Swiss-Prot record:
The keyword Metal-binding applies. InterPro entries: Cyt_B5-like_heme/steroid-bd (IPR001199), Cyt_B5-like_heme/steroid_sf (IPR036400), Cyt_B5_heme-BS (IPR018506), Cytochrome_b5/Flavoprotein_Rdt (IPR051872). The lineage of its organism: Eukaryota, Fungi, Dikarya, Ascomycota, Saccharomycotina. This is Increased recombination centers protein 21. Belongs to the cytochrome b5 family. It comes from the Eukaryota. GO terms for cellular component: cytoplasm.
Amino acid sequence: MSSDGMNRDVSNSKPNVRFAAPQRLSVAHPAISSPLHMPMSKSSRKPLVRTKIRLDPGHSALDWHSLTSNPANYYTKFVSLQLIQDLLDDPVFQKDNFKFSPSQLKNQLLVQKIPLYKIMPPLRINRKIVKKHCKGEDELWCVINGKVYDISSYLKFHPGGTDILIKHRNSDDLITYFNKYHQWVNYEKLLQVCFIGVVCE
């Protein structure tokens, strides 16, 4: 047979190939207990609704920022020199801060008037002293993440009102409540001028 004949036979031949019929894919739906179908929690069904508190005029977040940005307000609005003197005279405070030279500390705080938040290392404030200054709306100290703040001047600026802060004034640490409502807020920056020291037992 010639080569031309062989080529014609090959070109005319049809391959006998059978393709299997497409199969339907079976998709297994996850059971209710699957992590993809976790039951909704109460918190996800009912988001936390907070009652809006009407603040007094001049007590907005911008007003607080303006007030705290002026260094001249530190000893008139936030921490008084009399308060610092009372701390320096307190035997409990003296014992907890024995590493500081009393004369040097007095010079820094009362003569040079260095703000408490700039003292390094921070002053140690005993819980006994903190509790002594938790009187209510007139004077309110608190602990947030181990740091002591005199938030008396901030009370009327608090978006959630004064009552909730006064209600929890005897808490060992307010960080749990703070994170519940203000987790995105930098409290160290917000309350910098209110900083007194770090809590100790």
